[in-house]
């Protein structure tokens, strides 16, 4: 059995929070991409999309690409895209790649 990813989606007013648990990689990134598309295609879309990655322990470049694609799509629909919480490994990944200032609060 390969890595798993669970996503809990909570809509509260005009804000949506995705809480992710597991790993984001080549095998699981399509699941995240699909969920981001569903959330951002809502009418009206949320004004703020918050991702909680506190329980994500691994992310490869595929996962990074999905986050950047989601951020770009969010900007297209006037939605603020933020990663609110990260695990230490993901915080380090964001620091190394320069995404910390772009994606986190």
Go through each PLM region and give its residues:
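Amphipathic alpha-helical interaction surfaces in cytosolic regulatory modules
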Residues: 23-103
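STAS-typified acidic loop motif
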Residues: 4-34
């Amino acid at each position: 059995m390969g890595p798993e990813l669970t996503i809990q989606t909570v809509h509260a007013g005009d804000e949506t929070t995705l809480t992710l648990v597991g790993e984001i990689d080549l095998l699981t990134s399509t699941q995240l991409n699909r969920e981001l598309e569903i959330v951002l295609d809502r009418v009206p879309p949320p004004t703020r999309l918050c991702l909680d990655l506190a329980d994500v322990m691994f992310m490869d470049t595929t996962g990074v690409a999905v986050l950047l694609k989601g951020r770009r799509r969010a900007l297209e629909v006037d939605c603020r895209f933020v990663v609110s919480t990260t695990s230490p490994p993901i915080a380090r990944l964001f620091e190394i790649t320069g995404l910390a200032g772009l994606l986190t609060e």
